[in-house]
């Protein structure tokens, strides 16, 4: 009888102990995820903030998901900011492509790093002609590593008015540098198309060209093509091919931003777990 009584008491003690341990573990985990989140928000370095968001996510803090994605964006994207990457020119070759930083769509912008949010704001201001963004573009152009006088060409916009609003001030700034030859008046607009950055469905936009290349750039051989944002790169490739028809050779592409991919929860969690394993 004593043995049975002892067994019952031991079982109850073990049961209570397990529940206390689980309760304490859950309580610790709850506190830990908030502590990690604070580190993510207020860390002194980019690495520290990424570490905080990653551990908050792994501890169960769902709010950390997109914060971690943005803080670790270079691990999810093939291209890195201010680093030359081969760009398929659509003509069977590649040319160097450089962008300043990642551009975040509005639905995830609040999750971005300070640098990403600043760049995304600059892109929008540049589109509307409120800033020339010349410092950003000049930094990116320097990373191409090209020599000689560079002819600067600008991507066509939906209409002539938007084109000059966007690029006139930038072209003026470029003209101050002897190694840059901006050709703002390199095309004639013959029609108006739907604006891409204001469209909710880019697939609905016509790919037909709404410009004709002017004679003053025909045959130019050392050209850089400038645009605000690269998303798929299809528009850039289309214009490169159009320029080639006029004997124009594009040797580099520079954009303010590279639009990021919106990742699934599974993709983000997989990378977080991979990073955690690498540390240990």
Residue ranges and their predicted role:
Residues 149-158:
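Short glycine-rich phosphate-binding loop at a beta-alpha junction
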